[in-house]
Curated annotation (Swiss-Prot):
Record-listed E.C. numbers: 3.6.4.13
Family from the record: Belongs to the DEAD box helicase family. DEAH subfamily.
Protein name from the UniProt record: Putative ATP-dependent RNA helicase R563
Organism: Acanthamoeba polyphaga mimivirus
Catalytic reaction annotation: ATP + H2O = ADP + phosphate + H(+)
Length: 573
């Protein structure tokens, strides 16, 4: 116990001073590594934040829990492993991740992040030359998995929550690590309730590490729910109490106007429970340009839009859109019509079935979907690969756009294999092996100009854990009511070192977000959705800034978190 006496409690007035002094060797210097050192490293090295956190959450320290708010290129998974490796002979290690990322966590344990503990250097060399379907390859992976399973229990969210409900999760003397924790946060969701109760009924010798690059995905109140998993004695207010404590809302003729308040109080609540690291510096990502493409509705679109919106207005009453729950059916007909109107003026399958090949000519599509026409023309002109996204997988977006591409002499990769003018659809109901194949073909250097697959068409299943390389253009067919979703989509194409091996003038991604506008209406549904997203982004950014300033490592990592020309972070003292 004596070693713990030399540590300062998180609510001690001198806590930040203690951290800065005790861990001063982890202060990131002003001079950063170069683009080449980041993207073409000559040897494997741990990043400074990974080293610091493995020292901070450690069997010899008293610190029980932490939110690791680290962004893209920070190596969050390896950070978790570096922390866990210090506990593996002393505690149980339980990992909870989205089902789609379970394999990714095991791969990271097989990497140099965990040294040669779960895969020897000889085995690593053999895997590089063996085919993944071969018996030898599978045998090496099986042996490696057995080594991992001796120390790590890895659950998907669903499995973990099922076991909680069956009373089969025992967190005594456990290090619990939850990745992409924002997926489990919701006032009304069953995941959160089960998670909260299990964590708060766990014995004092449990430690909790939760990780996310987006601590507020939709509503500001999510950060209170997240932090309340970590803090035992001073819970943040939630729901309407959170709003009244930390936000001012005024209403004028244009709708609500939002401001934050009591940020010092908010920082007091989260003090000692947040680590913030921006991740890789801006110069290792491709540059990006964002364009809002305001597309005037056709006469037919205007007529159908007014008819549908008249019905939907009666069903939809959302006043405070930053804090209220919004259903996926929010103005769904109006939103689909803003993308495409069908010849029989119906929406959904009935509308789609009325669309014939003659309706896909340039002259006709100009009347049915000015948006689609603009996207089609940009794809044809683009000298490289393109990622097209819609929230609508079927009749208001991807499915019908695929038909348009086929009519204009593009071919579906699934049925025609690779070649020029190919597109591939990426959706949740496809075989994971097929998606891996698409990604491998698309991301190969020899596809830089789209000679194998030019266009990826994606819907909401593409949000997490997917990287596309060397993309030149991203087209988002319609806005969504939170900007995190749009940033997540854009982030599929703007990746850490994703354009490292292309010419300098091609290290740029042009991002287009399409808004259908109605000349006789002050604000169309697309414009309204965009305003909602930007208002939320502004208010959420204020809470995120407070998290950054209250982070335990604010001073240590400041040189890597703020770059010239950016808004400064004032670290708490």
């Amino acid at each position: 116990m004596s070693s713990r006496l030399s540590y300062v409690n998180v609510d001690d007035p001198n806590f930040y001073e203690f951290i800065d002094e005790k861990y001063s060797k982890y202060k990131i210097p002003p001079k950063q590594k170069t683009f080449k050192q980041f993207c073409f490293p000559s040897k494997y090295e741990f990043q400074i934040p990974q080293q610091f956190l493995a020292e901070y959450i450690n069997p010899k320290t008293p610190y029980k829990g932490l939110l690791i708010y680290h962004r893209i290129g920070a190596g969050k998974t390896c950070t978790a492993i570096k922390i866990a490796e210090n506990f593996k002979n002393k505690s149980k290690i339980m990992i909870v991740v989205p089902a789609s990322l379970k394999g990714n966590f095991r791969s990271e344990l097989r990497s140099l992040c965990a040294d040669d503990h779960y895969l020897t250097s000889k085995e690593r060399s053999e895997l590089k030359i063996l085919h993944p379907s071969s018996d030898e390859y599978k045998s090496i992976i099986k042996v490696s998995d057995d080594r991992i399973d001796k120390y790590y229990t890895i659950y998907s969210y669903n499995k973990f929550v099922d076991l909680i409900k069956q009373n089969k999760i025992n967190l005594t003397n456990t290090l619990l690590i939850i990745d992409e924790v924002h997926n489990m946060i919701s006032e009304t969701g069953t995941y959160y309730e089960s998670l909260y109760e299990t964590i708060h009924s766990a014995p004092d010798n449990m430690r909790l590490v939760i990780m996310t690059a987006t601590p507020i995905f939709d509503k500001p109140n999510e950060i209170a729910l997240t932090m309340n998993l970590l803090v035992r004695n001073k819970q943040l207010p939630v729901g309407p109490d959170f709003v009244s404590t930390f936000m001012d809302i005024r209403y004028n003729s244009k709708g609500p106007v939002y401001h934050v308040k009591n940020m010092d109080l908010f920082k007091e609540f989260v003090k000692g429970y947040v680590s913030y690291y921006r991740g890789a510096p801006p110069y290792v990502f491709p540059k990006s340009e964002l364009f809002f493409v305001r597309t005037k509705m056709s006469d037919l679109q205007k007529t159908v839009y007014q008819k549908i919106t008249g019905k939907e207005v009666k069903q939809t009453k959302v006043r405070d859109y930053v804090n209220e729950n919004i259903s996926n059916n929010f103005f769904i007909g109006t939103r689909m019509i803003s993308n495409i109107v069908y010849p029989n003026e119906k929406v959904g399958l009935k509308g789609y079935n009325s669309l014939t090949d003659e309706d896909l000519t340039i002259a006709k599509i100009r009347e049915y979907s000015p948006k689609f026409l603009k996207i089609l023309r940009k794809i044809k002109r683009c000298n490289g690969t393109v990622f097209v996204y819609s929230n609508f997988k079927e009749y208001g977006g991807i499915r019908v756009f695929a038909r348009l591409l086929e009519f204009h002499r593009f071919k579906n990769y699934e049925f025609n294999g690779s070649g020029p003018r190919r597109f591939a659809i990426w959706s949740g109901d496809q075989d994971p092996i097929y998606k891996e194949e698409v990604k491998a073909v698309f991301n190969n250097k020899d596809n830089e100009f789209g000679s194998k697959i030019k266009v990826i068409l994606g819907s909401s299943s593409i949000k997490e854990g997917v990287s596309f390389l060397r993309v030149q253009e991203v087209h988002i067919m319609e806005p969504y009511w939170n900007f995190s979703r749009m940033e997540q989509i854009i982030g599929r194409a703007i990746r850490f070192c994703s354009h490292k091996d292309v010419e300098l003038d091609r290290q740029l991604v042009k991002v287009y977000i399409y808004l259908a506008v109605h000349p006789d209406i002050k604000m169309s549904i697309d414009e309204r959705m965009m305003k909602m997203a930007l208002d939320k982004k502004m208010i959420n950014s204020a809470f995120e800034k407070a998290l950054k300033e209250a982070a335990i490592d604010c001073e240590l990592f400041k040189n890597a978190n703020v770059y010239p020309g950016e808004q400064d972070i004032q670290c708490e003292q």
